[in-house]
Amino acid sequence: MKLKGGVNGIGYNTISNNILFKDFEQNILSEIASNFVEEIWPAHTCSNCENLKHKFHIIISGRLKVFQTDKETGREFTLFLLTKNDFFDVISLVDGCNHKIYYESLEEVKMLSTATFTMRKWLKTYPKLNERLLSYIGKQLLRVEDYAVNHTFFEIPARLARLILENLNHKSQKLEYINDLSNEEIANLIGSTRAVVNRHFQDFKKEGILKISRKKMEVINLPLLLKKATNE
């Protein structure tokens, strides 16, 4: 993990375009940006909430996996896949609690960080920050709700189809964010195993739903994929 003091133009742009600080006056943005430093996590850097609860992060680029793990079995469950303009850890920020959560960079991840107490000070100083933070928390809760519904009512092929649809660029018919993930990482997103996901991917390929090559996947029959997503 590398740290850089202060922020450059990219860092300022990240702050000014983030949902939390967008439309703030320029002098306020400059003051806020001056309190952030840039961090670089090389691929597969891991950390946990205990180590990071004193800092608030905003992602500039790359993907960060937020997950829990069963120490006895080694199985993982991925709660969120954070990307550009996402931020963490919201729970530690608003409640100060230490929850059991882990983070792993899936590739090099660049982010900005500031002290949690500084962020809390801004929440008191700028009330609209609270509204925007609540909106973000609401969206995260909806993701967890969607997972609970999918896990309860849908079989694994349908869950897999829904994950693909959620990450599909409908213009290019190509996947974004999860396109180059291993089958094990994809399994962690839907509560399954690598072997089961691999089997269903091969079924999707045989049925003419997907075109699969090395670390690339393309939807070639959207109607069939939509049908799969409904347990049919």
What are these language model-derived features?
Residues 167-232:
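Phosphate-/nucleic-acid-contacting segments
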Residues 28, 34, 78-135, 142:
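Cyclic-nucleotide recognition modules
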Residues 45-52:
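Short phosphate-coordinating micro-motif centered on Lys-Gly-acidic
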Residues 124, 128-191:
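Polybasic "coupling" helices that flank or enter modular domains
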Residues 54-67, 84-85:
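Glycine- and acidic-residue-biased ligand/ion/polar-headgroup-sensing regions
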Residues 72-77:
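Short alpha-helix-to-loop micro-motif enriched in aromatics/charged/Gly
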Residues 1-42, 87, 92-94:
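Cyclic nucleotide-binding regulatory module and flanking cytosolic helices
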Residues 42, 60-61, 83, 107:
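A cytosolic small-molecule/anion-sensing beta-strand core signal
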